[in-house]
Curated annotation (Swiss-Prot):
Protein's UniProt name: General negative regulator of transcription subunit 2
Species this chain originates from: Schizosaccharomyces pombe (strain 972 / ATCC 24843)
Role, per record: Acts as a component of the CCR4-NOT core complex, which in the nucleus seems to be a general transcription factor, and in the cytoplasm the major mRNA deadenylase involved in mRNA turnover. NOT2 is required for the integrity of the complex. The NOT protein subcomplex negatively regulates the basal and activated transcription of many genes. Preferentially affects TC-type TATA element-dependent transcription. Could directly or indirectly inhibit component(s) of the general transcription machinery.
Disulfide bond sites: none
One Pfam family hit: NOT2_3_5_C
GO CC aspect terms: CCR4-NOT complex; CCR4-NOT core complex; cytosol; nucleus; P-body
Length: 306
């Protein structure tokens, strides 16, 4: 209700007296008993003046001026205020009102053309697959292959008995593969290769069992290149069986020259021609040498055991 209507409801007009509306007797009594009677008369006159000015201004306004929007309270019947109130209620409750829907349509039409002309960019289309909207087809199982990949597969649907027989039983002990029946069939295409016969030998004999077939140079190579190994011991034993002796001081192997007898022999030493094997130059050298029996390694001839 406007200010003019409220004042008119109180019967306050420019030519009427506030006391007249109440009654003559009451007005005189108030004048006699109210010490602020002079002040009330001035307030009544001021209010009457304001009402007269409002009515005069209202009568002078043209229809076009009366419909001009007021920046504080737009519209005489507060229609814009009600529209704004309905918008707030729509935002809070999530329900759109007719006024808000009409305004949305006006706003979209006021922009460049209509919203139907707007097209999505490739970047927007690629971004949709990482949003929550992309999970809806998977949850609804619209694509069976994609649902199996994302959500997995029920083992019971594959014919596997999941009834717990034992508490510590593992599924891997019974279910080797969902496609285990395919392993019994022959492959569609045979591989184009042949396996060599050497790959089919199972547990070949150890190399030490064939050490008697090696040459002297091979035995020397094994002895000097495999220290503290079982093959070094086997090579030393085989060289001893072939009449080679190891000199502990010189750290070389020597043997008497075949067909030549010792020039001198005693219980402690003997002198004659011997064949030495030089590991540095890797060759055999013939020398006249005085051999002390105590300098030789004490090793008896015996078979090499694997």
């Amino acid at each position: 209700m406007s200010l003019a209507n409220r004042l008119s409801h109180l019967n306050i007009t420019g030519g009427n007296d506030f006391k007249a509306s109440i009654g003559p007797s009451v007005g005189r009594q108030n004048e006699a008993t109210n010490p602020w009677s002079s002040t009330s008369h001035s307030l009544e006159n001021s209010a009457a003046t304001v009402v007269n000015e409002l009515q005069t201004t209202k009568e002078q306004k043209t229809p076009e001026q009366s419909t001009t929007a007021n920046p504080l309270f737009p519209g005489n019947d507060f229609s814009d205020f009600n529209n704004h109130k309905s918008k707030l209620l729509g935002v809070i409750t999530g329900k759109s009102t007719p006024s808000s829907q009409a305004e949305k349509s006006d706003t979209t039409n006021s922009k460049t053309g209509s919203t139907e002309e707007l097209t999505e960019t490739p970047a927007d289309e690629n971004a949709k697959q990482y949003m929550l909207e992309s999970l809806l087809p998977i949850i609804r199982m619209e694509d069976s292959e994609m649902s199996t990949l994302q959500l997995g597969c029920d083992l019971a649907a594959l014919g596997f008995d999941l009834a717990p027989v034992e508490e510590d039983r593992l599924i891997s002990t019974n279910l080797f593969s969902p496609w285990a029946e395919l392993n019994t069939k022959k492959p569609v295409s045979q591989p184009m290769f042949k396996l060599p016969a050497c790959y089919k030998n199972v547990n070949p004999p150890p190399a030490i069992s064939k050490i008697f077939q090696f040459s002297d140079e091979t035995l020397f190579y094994i002895f000097y290149t495999m220290p503290r190994d079982v093959m070094q011991e086997a090579a030393a034993q085989e060289l001893t069986n072939r009449n080679w002796r190891f000199h502990k001081e010189l750290r070389v192997w020597l043997t008497p020259v075949p067909g030549m007898k010792p020039l001198q022999r005693t219980p402690q030493f003997e002198r004659g021609y011997y064949m030495f094997f030089d590991p540095i130059h890797w060759k055999r050298i013939k020398k006249d040498f005085l051999l002390m029996y105590a300098a030789l390694e004490d090793r008896a001839q015996s078979a090499v055991h694997s």
